[in-house]
Amino acid sequence: MRHRHDLRAAGLRASAMTLVLVAALVTGAAPGRAGEIVPSVGLTKAVNGGGEATAQVGLAFRGDLAPFLMSELGVTYRSESRFDDQLKLRMWPVTASLYLKPLPALYAGGGVGWYHTTYDYAPGVPIADQTKQEYGVHLGGGLKVPLGAGAGLDLGGRYVMMRDQNSRLIPQRFDPDFWVTSIGLAFKF
């Protein structure tokens, strides 16, 4: 019972932080400050999954809150196989991040995320598929390379940390942490 209360409290804190970051992004777009939309593709790999890296796609919206501080709201899609392809995870992370920019081309920081996760079991496994909502945190950074006045190349990476997950397969628990590297094209507006 206590564990469920702790998870609910953590979810409420993450939701509150996300709302604060969204409000900061919306109100922080003062005249003269540029926003960006960044479609991206990349590779993602589970830290303890033992499988191959798989492709991921994403879309992020960024805005400068100050000359040295950038906010980001992002959505991605990723999938991975576990337990010798007996379980396929499909995940739709929705994240909010704050990045420090010590130089205009470099950024580093972290944030929170809501991870809509579907557990698809192989047809021969007598377990029903299920979908869960999880929360996590991430650390990351990147390099922005200008391609002109209105666009730039964005090279990024992040490490995502989540609580261990239960599985109906053996072993019954697994570490869902993963890393992502991506390349995107940032369009300024």
Model-derived segments and their meaning:
Residues 1-35:
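Cleavable N-terminal export/targeting peptides
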Residues 19-20, 27-28, 160, 185-188:
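Hydrophobic alpha-helical segments of integral membrane proteins
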Residues 33-45, 106, 178:
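Transmembrane beta-strand segments of Gram-negative outer membrane beta-barrel proteins
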Residues 41-45, 122-126, 165-168:
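Extracytoplasmic loops and strand-loop junctions of Gram-negative outer membrane beta-barrel proteins
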Residues 46-55, 83-87:
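Solvent-exposed loop/turn segments connecting transmembrane beta-strands
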Residues 60-155, 161, 176-189:
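Gram-negative (and chloroplast) outer-membrane scaffold detector with strong preference
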Residues 170-174:
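Short proline/glycine-enriched turn/loop segments at secondary-structure junctions
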